[in-house]
Amino acid sequence: KKLDIGIDLELFRQLTITADYFNEKRYNILLHREAWPESLGYYTAKPWSNKGKVDNWGIELSVNWRKEFTKDLYVDFRGNFTYTENKYVNLDEPVYPYVWKTSTGKPLSRTTGYIAQGLFSSQEEIDNSPTQNLGSTVKPGDIKYRDVNGDGKIDGSDQVMISPYGTTPRIQYGLGMNVTYKKFDFGVFFNGSAKRTIMISGISPFGQSDYNVMQF
């Protein structure tokens, strides 16, 4: 089901405006049955089902202004703006022990991770804090993470949605200009995005060592 409402305007034979609002409800999306009892023997081979539901909505706006100074010289200015949101409505999820592990009702593109509470300042603080078994030996200067479920250890159960934004930007925009004189044309265009979260993890200054920033 999709609703699309659009408006096109032209003013003074120079300014054109196009605006659109869309609202799409997608259903019958093919996915694995996650809420499937292991007792049925399908733990490693979960059946497929058309139970997925996703909502998408947003707006699109474009503006163009053209000014003719002479029959040989004219200028164009243009801009565009797009804002979109979405969320999972149904994923056939199992009943998780912690409500923050569910994806239903949350954006498709979001960022999950551990909640940082500063840095460890001493070995004594490490010894008196929840155990962090995240692949390396914890030392003073390492990041201290929150024990969200209070079980005395930091593991995957403590990962939560730390940002409603993911790698897909919710906002995209652009600005451009063209100047035309006879057979010559000059143009510039700028574009950008916003409401996006990326994890900067491709470059690690400490390699695979066990050291941290306070030891370099």
What are these regions (language model features)?
Residues L30-A35, G156, S204-F206:
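Conserved active-site-proximal loop/helix segments of enzymes involved in bacterial cell-wall
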Residues G6, G135, G176:
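Short, surface-exposed charged micro-motifs
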Residues K1, D55, Y165-G176:
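Short, glycine/acidic-rich beta->alpha junctions
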Residues Y43-P47, Q159, R170:
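Glycine- and acidic
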Residues K1-T111, V179:
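Extracellular/periplasmic, surface-exposed regions of secreted and cell-surface proteins
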Residues G52, R66-T167, G207-F216:
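Conserved small-residue
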Residues Y21-F22, Y114, F120, Y145, ...:
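Aromatic side chains
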Residues R26, E85, N178-F216:
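C-terminal beta-signal and adjacent terminal beta-strands/loops
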